[in-house]
């Protein structure tokens, strides 16, 4: 077992308390990127101080954007450059482990005429699929090269004059959609993105708030149309808590006996709340309090209490984009439902930071879970009796936190290798866990 950054989690006890989860990762990335191409100042509060958004900030600084040193829990101000005023960087843009950084920057930089850019990442990111972004950008006139015929990083971009067009995306991916929309800001005419299913819409909401000419048409908002030629104006942004981070506590409170947790000021964007649909199907006991809307994003507090005899669930089809990041913790939940749960149509998880279907099946089996791994999902027999185990996050932040919650249900003490992976999206996860353990 890898002895670096091992965390020991003791099973038993309950979770009690009130907490705020870190700022939404998706909105944190977009506040930096859209603030950078706006005119004037953008004031940001509630930013997620973690590896991925900080990678975005570092890349934007190399492109000439005035972003101050970002400090934990402190607001800051960006001075935007406008849509077409990035400088050619003197060094390679390192996106770290962040697929969002790389894919959104690909869209942003493709139309920066006469300038050249190289994007790379860590070993994991450089194996993730980038062709789903480079191909539509090439249709718009983008000049993009990379390993394996432009489908893997490092990626080289030569800024070029782009033309608006209609693009159908093969998968419902907010990152792919966002890259095309950002490229559309610098393309001639109108750019239209047609998705096979709705994906998270933080980019559309924020672009509209900044003054972009953007419209959503068609069934379930699957056709997004953006026109170039409109300057964006800096805004004040308050970033809500990330529901994908809150999900670990929502499930933990539901499955750890005698638990009750209140999570304050969580983002409740309807393209992100698939986890609540599944919790309803399971029969979880939760209540949403203090609802409000800030900068177009709905927020609220969530009070969750333990329930015995949770029902099994099935996740498939159009709901997947609304809870794609929650599948690892839902796999843990399924182990404690009274019956067989199924996750399908989730092949996208095989090209995340890790192959999350394989990793979760492998690691949960070490606790004694009864899981069948399928090509596009998992079949999980519930009512498991977990024993202690030595498990490994395999450097995946969502796997690390899911295994921590699983360990709470195991008899004895479990060890999680490479537990520090959680810092990618939730730097204070282990501190918050300690506060909640009763």
UniProtKB/Swiss-Prot annotation:
Please state where this protein is localized: Cytoplasm
Q: Please state what class of enzyme this protein is.
A: transferase
Q: Which domain of life is it from?
A: Bacteria
Predominant location category: cytoplasm
Keyword annotations for this protein, in alphabetical order, are: Amino-acid biosynthesis, Aromatic amino acid biosynthesis, Cytoplasm, Transferase
Q: Where is the active site?
A: 325
- Where in the chain are disulfide-linked cysteines found? none
Gene3D superfamilies the UniProt entry points to: Enolpyruvate transferase domain
Spell out the Pfam families in the cross-references: EPSP_synthase
Q: Which residues bind phosphoenolpyruvate?
A: 25, 99, 128, 175, 356, 398
Q: Where does 3-phosphoshikimate bind?
A: 25-26, 30, 173, 175, 325, 352
A single GO BP annotation from the record? aromatic amino acid family biosynthetic process
Q: Which pathway, metabolic or otherwise, does it act in? A: Metabolic intermediate biosynthesis; chorismate biosynthesis; chorismate from D-erythrose 4-phosphate and phosphoenolpyruvate: step 6/7
Entry GO CC: cytoplasm
Q: Which reaction does it catalyse?
A: 3-phosphoshikimate + phosphoenolpyruvate = 5-O-(1-carboxyvinyl)-3-phosphoshikimate + phosphate
UniProt EC number: 2.5.1.19
Any GO MF annotation of the entry: 3-phosphoshikimate 1-carboxyvinyltransferase activity
Subunit and interaction comment: Monomer.
Q: What role is this protein assigned? A: Catalyzes the transfer of the enolpyruvyl moiety of phosphoenolpyruvate (PEP) to the 5-hydroxyl of shikimate-3-phosphate (S3P) to produce enolpyruvyl shikimate-3-phosphate and inorganic phosphate.
Q: According to its UniProt record, which protein family does this protein belong to? A: Belongs to the EPSP synthase family.
Matching NCBIfam families = aroA (TIGR01356)
Write the protein's name: 3-phosphoshikimate 1-carboxyvinyltransferase
Taxonomy-wise, where does this protein's organism fall, top ranks first? Bacteria, Bacillati, Cyanobacteriota, Cyanophyceae, Synechococcales
Q: What would be the name of the gene that encodes this protein?
A: aroA
